[in-house]
Each structure stands twice: as structure tokens, then as C-alpha cells.
Amino acid sequence: MVAVRRRRTQASNPRSEPPQHMSDHDSDSDWDTVCEECSSGKQPAKLLLCDKCDKGFHLFCLRPILVSVPKGSWFCPSCSKHQIPKSFPLIQTKIIDFFRIKRSPDSSQISSSSDSIGKKRKKTSLVMSKKKRRLLPYNPSNDPQRRLEQMASLATALRASNTKFSNELTYVSGKAPRSANQAAFEKGGMQVLSKEGVETLALCKKMMDLGECPPLMVVFDPYEGFTVEADRFIKDWTIITEYVGDVDYLSNREDDYDGDSMMTLLHASDPSQCLVICPDRRSNIARFISGINNHSPEGRKKQNLKCVRFNINGEARVLLVANRDISKGERLYYDYNGYEHEYPTEHFV
């Protein structure tokens, strides 16, 4: 469909024409639009047209569910050749190149740094620890082969999403410059990450640079799409990852219907200064962590991570942190609507 630009919604029903006496409203809801999955013409604004067969599907009837109309061409499951994503090759050199892993002459230094942070905390009294909890670095899996499998699972998801790996916020020409990211602009202020917290985050970054990734597996679910599961026990208050991607002004993305993974970075009093993180081109594992259903008690019970924005050296950063102990094999979830409450989650599992 290239002759007329439209949002590929309101799929026509070729099986019948509406009677002349019907109103335009009845025509739109009962005749002009239909979902091939539920056979309903309701909510025509959420019906997506296949660019090949022109059949309609509700965004929430698709598997996995779509939360917004995608950019460019879209093909229904019958017309699409997309099946289970092809796994990234479990070859060390390819994984090292994909993640740009730095070779370290002595990786034991990283482990000792993590242990020293833990020893410092043990000296703190129980009373003090209750008053001021501290962030923990994640503990990588001990088995190097298992870490390769974990990274290969992430590479599979990134490649299927046509996304390059990045573990930092990126500032590119034509979008928001780094100078725009000033935590001081945050409406109501932003909490400052402590010196020890900054050191803990830096340790997590260093471990990832050396291939000691978080103990997580990216798993493709036919209902939810790519999901993330804990591959070992994770303690409460452990840093899971930083939410990264291209930084842009919110005003540039207000009409981005495909920006379902955008994250608030800066919620400024001046709307022109509001920033978002866009992981559609560059991202890490944060992009694939699932959101809870805010509309059901069962959905809220699944939450095991929280999204927290910190002032780090004057800049806004977003961290995903465990908000309780997480068992091995447990799927990771956090609240997509922690700030603006604008993300549609009513059809989430």
C-alpha cells in the first residue's frame, strides 16, 4: 500500500457490503472493519491491515501482542515468513565481535572488586542497612559456556529486531545532544545516586565489557514475544541493567506510533526539554524485559523489577533494579507506567 499513506487500520470486509440504510457509525463498527481472529468489528482504530492480503487483525489479538501500529510494511502471520527467530551462532569469536567484548588479562580482578563491595556491606550494622539500602552488582554465572549461551540469546533477539548492541546512552546528530540531558531540569527534582551506587553501576558496566554479562536468558514466547528470565538466583536490590538507546526529545517522538519501547529519561517542567530513550536502533537486554498488566491484580503480582531514574554526575540515567529476591527461571517484569501512565497494558498477560 504505497498510493495513500494511512495507519493501516480499519480493514475492509470483502465478504459483504453494508446496507444503504445503515449509518456511518454502524458501517464502521459492524461492516467495514473485522478482525480475522475474533470476528469483531469493534475498536476499528486498533485493527491492523496486512499489506499483502489486506485482512484485519486487532493489535491485541495478534501473538505476540502489538501495542502500536508498526512503521513501514506489516504482514499477518499467514503472509509472513517470520517464525521462531533464528538462533545466533554459539561461536565465541562471533559473540565477542557482536558485543565488542574487551579481552582482559586477568578477569579475576573483576570478581575481587565485586567481593570487596560485598565485604564492605557486611561491616554495616543491621540498623543502618534498614535505614539506607544499597544497590548490589549482579553476579555473573560462573560457567563461561553458560555466559556465552546467555549472550547468544540476547544477540538472537537484537538481530531479529534489527538492533545493534549498546550498553550506554547514545547521542546522535539530529536528535537531542548530550548537553540537553541535565537532571536539574527534572520536574520536582531527581534523586542523586550515591557514590557507592555509582561505583556499583560502573562495576556492572565493566563486567559487561569483559563478557561477564548479567545472569539472564532471552526466551522467545509465542504469546509475549521476546522475554527475559533469570538464569540464577538474583538478590533484592541488584542492578539488572541500565535502560539505554538513542536519546531524543519527546516532541520529536510524539507521533512515533512504533515507539512502544520508548522510556522516559527526563520529565521536565518545560515540555520542550523532556527527553526519552529510544532503543529501536541501539539497545541492550532492557528492551526485552516484559511489562506487567496494570489493570489486573495478577499482573501486579508478577512485578519483580522497578524502574528508577537517578541523577548521576548531573545527567539523568534509568536503571532496572530487582525489587525482591528473584528465583532462577522466573520471568522478569516491571511497570511500564511508572511515571506517565500512558502505556496501554490492558491486554498484557
UniProtKB/Swiss-Prot annotation:
UniProt effect for mutating F98A: Loss of methylation activity
GO MF annotations in UniProt: histone H3K27 methyltransferase activity; histone H3K27 monomethyltransferase activity; zinc ion binding
Record PROSITE patterns: SET, ZF_PHD_1, ZF_PHD_2
Record's miscellaneous remark: The binding to histone H3.2 is unaffected by mono-, di, or trimethylation at H3K9, but is strongly reduced by increasing levels of H3K4 methylation.
Family statement drawn from the similarity comment of this UniProt entry: Belongs to the class V-like SAM-binding methyltransferase superfamily. Histone-lysine methyltransferase family. TRX/MLL subfamily.
Keyword Zinc part of the UniProt annotation: yes
Enzyme class per UniProt: transferase
Record's subcellular location: Nucleus
Gene that produces this protein: ATXR6
Zinc fingers (PHD-type) by residue: 32-82
The enzyme's E.C. designation: 2.1.1.369
GO CC annotation, single: nucleus
Residue positions binding substrate: M190, R309, Y339, E340
Phenotype seen when the gene is deleted: No visible phenotype. Atxr5 and atxr6 double mutant is smaller than wild-type plants, shows partial decondensation of the chromocenter, decreased H3K27 monomethylation and increased DNA re-replication.
Organism: Arabidopsis thaliana (Mouse-ear cress)
Residue span of region Disordered: 1-28, 105-126
InterPro entries linked to this entry: ATXR5/ATXR6, SET_dom, SET_dom_sf, Zinc_finger_PHD-type_CS, Znf_FYVE_PHD, Znf_PHD, Znf_PHD-finger, Znf_RING/FYVE/PHD
Residues annotated for S-adenosyl-L-methionine binding in this entry: E224, G225, F226, R287, F288, I289, S290, G291, Y343, V349
Record's compositionally biased regions (Low complexity): 106-116
Span(s) of short sequence motif PIP motif: 92-99
PANTHER family (alphabetical): SET DOMAIN-CONTAINING PROTEIN
Matches recorded under Pfam families: PHD (PF00628), SET (PF00856)
Occurrences of domain SET (ranges): 214-337
Protein name stated in the entry: Histone-lysine N-methyltransferase ATXR6
Catalytic activity line of the entry: L-lysyl(27)-[histone H3] + S-adenosyl-L-methionine = N(6)-methyl-L-lysyl(27)-[histone H3] + S-adenosyl-L-homocysteine + H(+)
Disulphide bonds in the chain: none
GO BP: anther dehiscence; methylation; regulation of cell cycle; regulation of DNA replication
